[in-house]
């Protein structure tokens, strides 16, 4: 019949020929998860800043100032240190060989992420004191599985899938992923804008809610040493 037996055997062994083409390829697993660990480092770094610095401004020798002025008195120091942390972390990523299509946007994205995270942690800590600091810890614990940093969010339990769009890490990680694997449409700007929404919420908490709780917080701070003694 003129049929080549070898051709038939090859067809039966592999009836479909697949051609693979990588879209936005990432050269290593380390580069793939670098956005997650970079975000984690920036959040932890911001939390450490809040933990080691006194958040309330000393009134001695300054005179009277408003609650808003007191809030920004520590704010400037913290965001500057947070920006320095972001530069060190992102440049460090580049030095150790993390894949990056656009190094400049990678570093600038890290600074924007750190700025947002420091504002969130600072607002929570100054407004709700120890409870706010505890919320900061809870947030980082929840965001590790809920941000799709290491595994697709579809593989996570339903609770974390529900939280996924509500977490700052989700957009911080996606922001850096754009600079690692390659840009797609306006995703970089979209994630940057969502981080801006979190920033606005943080400023609202710090500037609007904090003054309402200021007297209660001062009373709590005065009573705390007495209880310890």
Give the residues covered by each predicted segment:
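Membrane-spanning alpha-helical segments of multipass transporters and channels
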Residues: 1-229
């Amino acid at each position: 019949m003129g049929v080549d037996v070898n051709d038939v055997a090859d067809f039966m062994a592999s009836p479909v020929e697949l051609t693979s083409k990588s879209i936005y390829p990432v050269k290593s697993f380390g580069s793939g998860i670098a956005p997650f660990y970079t975000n984690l480092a920036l959040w932890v770094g911001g939390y450490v800043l809040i933990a080691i610095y006194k958040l309330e401004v000393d009134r001695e020798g300054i005179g009277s100032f408003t609650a808003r002025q007191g809030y920004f008195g520590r704010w400037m120091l913290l965001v500057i240190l947070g920006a320095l942390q972001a530069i060190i972390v992102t440049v460090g990523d580049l030095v150790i060989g993390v894949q990056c299509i656009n190094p400049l946007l990678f570093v600038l994205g890290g600074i924007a992420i750190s700025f947002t995270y420091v504002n969130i942690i600072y607002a929570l800590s100054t407004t709700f004191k120890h409870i706010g600091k505890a919320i900061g810890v809870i947030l980082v614990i929840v965001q590790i599985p809920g941000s799709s940093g290491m595994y697709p969010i579809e593989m996570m339990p339903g609770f974390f899938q529900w939280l996924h769009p509500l977490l700052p890490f989700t957009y911080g990680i996606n922001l850096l992923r754009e600079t690692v694997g390659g840009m797609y449409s306006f995703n970089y700007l979209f994630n940057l804008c969502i981080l801006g929404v979190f920033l606005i919420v943080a400023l609202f908490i710090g500037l609007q809610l904090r003054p309402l709780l200021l007297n209660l917080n001062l009373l709590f701070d005065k009573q705390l040493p007495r209880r310890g003694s």
